[in-house]
Regions:
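Active-site-adjacent substrate-binding region
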Residues: 44-132
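Acidic/histidine-rich catalytic neighborhood of metal-dependent amide-processing enzymes
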Residues: 1-50, 86
Length: 132
């Protein structure tokens, strides 16, 4: 297992290079909160699709099943105006399963607000998923 920390999703190249043996990649970013979305600041968001297209169905399903099995507060949402570092990985030609999770965050960039429960649910989902 590799842990990669990137901070370049805003410019589109954060995940453009990953170890050659990478099979799965889960990006941890922010989940959106707002009208027509299921996520709140207290939840972990599991993104099914964003501006780059759908995330891997099996990964999304596995994350949702893991969240449910561990009693975590979660929502599955679609973010049409959002992108993550996983997009750069796919654009670079890596054929991997990919997913995106994150704590629900109200607003972004200039004023981001979340709740410790959202951060906890995100951490617990990641921990449980990696441990299985």
């Amino acid at each position: 297992m590799s842990l990669l920390f990137t901070v370049y999703e805003e410019v589109g190249h954060g995940g453009s290079v990953v170890p050659a043996d990478t099979q799965d990649m889960i990006s941890v970013d922010m989940g959106c909160v707002g009208a027509d979305l299921g996520c709140t600041e207290r939840m972990v968001s599991i993104c099914a699709k964003d501006s780059g297209g759908p995330y891997n169905y099996d990964i999304v399903s596995e994350l949702a099943a893991c969240a449910k099995a561990n009693g975590l507060d979660y929502a599955i949402d679609v973010y049409p105006h959002y992108g993550s570092d996983v997009e750069a990985t796919l654009t670079a030609g890596f054929d991997i399963r990919h997913g995106l999770i994150g704590p629900g965050v109200y607003a972004s960039h200039n004023y981001e607000r979340s709740h410790m429960d959202g951060v906890r649910n995100t951490f617990e989902l990641l921990r449980a998923y990696v441990a299985q």
